[in-house]
Amino acid sequence: MAKLAKNKQMAVLNYIHKQVEDHGYPPTVREICSAVGLSSTSTVHGHISRLIEQGFLQKDPSKPRALEITPKGLDILGVKPIQKEIPMLGVVTAGQPILAVENATEFFPIPPSIQDNNDLFMLTIRGTSMIKAGIFNGDQVIVRKQSTAKNGDIVIAMNDDNEATCKRFYKEKTRFRLQPENDTMEPIFLDNVKILGKVVGLFRDHIF
């Protein structure tokens, strides 16, 4: 009985992988029922729960269909993870704003665990204004493209002069504040600001 249940779990995992590969999103529970020969949705939910417990699947609550196969899940299926790459768009200052370079000439490999790579890009930081947030001169930040931000988010922002900077974002009553994480530096106040993206990760190829 245990072997049969395990075989069904692998069938569920394999079908989820196939649907994601073919369509870009996982199947519904009822579609899984039909595909693997199960009549009860609760049985499928049970298999999914056990696959999550074993580390073969994970849930992303930010997505409507939240199932994702982990690197461990791909490994047990014998599938080699596809190496993902994101564009490196140049240098952005973490001190005074400079023009951001948006011509991708290089690409940076990222782990399979980092999803939505089509919405990510990388910039190299120049300056010391974000050191209290752990972002140092020469670091490369991974940025998710988005045009909005919440107070306290670390963002790449552009002003009306098309100058970009890495700062912590705050919306105040009559203006926007781009706050450095360095006690020796002053915030930047703007009437208008364009958000290019939110910093979601960091890569450093050196140690201090």
From Swiss-Prot:
Gene Ontology MF terms: DNA binding; serine-type endopeptidase activity
Gene Ontology biological process: DNA repair; DNA replication; negative regulation of DNA-templated transcription; proteolysis; SOS response
Catalytic reactions on record: Hydrolysis of Ala-|-Gly bond in repressor LexA
InterPro entries: LexA (IPR006200), LexA-like (IPR039418), LexA/Signal_pep-like_sf (IPR036286), LexA_DNA-bd_dom (IPR006199), LexA_repressor (IPR050077), Peptidase_S24_LexA (IPR006197), Peptidase_S24_S26A/B/C (IPR015927), WH-like_DNA-bd_sf (IPR036388)
Disulfide-bond pairs as recorded: none
Site keyed Cleavage: positions: 94-95
Enzyme class, first EC level, given as a word: hydrolase
Quaternary structure and interacting proteins, as annotated: Homodimer.
Described function: Represses a number of genes involved in the response to DNA damage (SOS response), including recA and lexA. In the presence of single-stranded DNA, RecA interacts with LexA causing an autocatalytic cleavage which disrupts the DNA-binding part of LexA, leading to derepression of the SOS regulon and eventually DNA repair.
PANTHER family: LEXA REPRESSOR (PTHR33516), LEXA REPRESSOR-RELATED (PTHR33516:SF2)
The protein, known as: LexA repressor
Organism: Limosilactobacillus reuteri (strain DSM 20016) (Lactobacillus reuteri)
Underlying gene: lexA
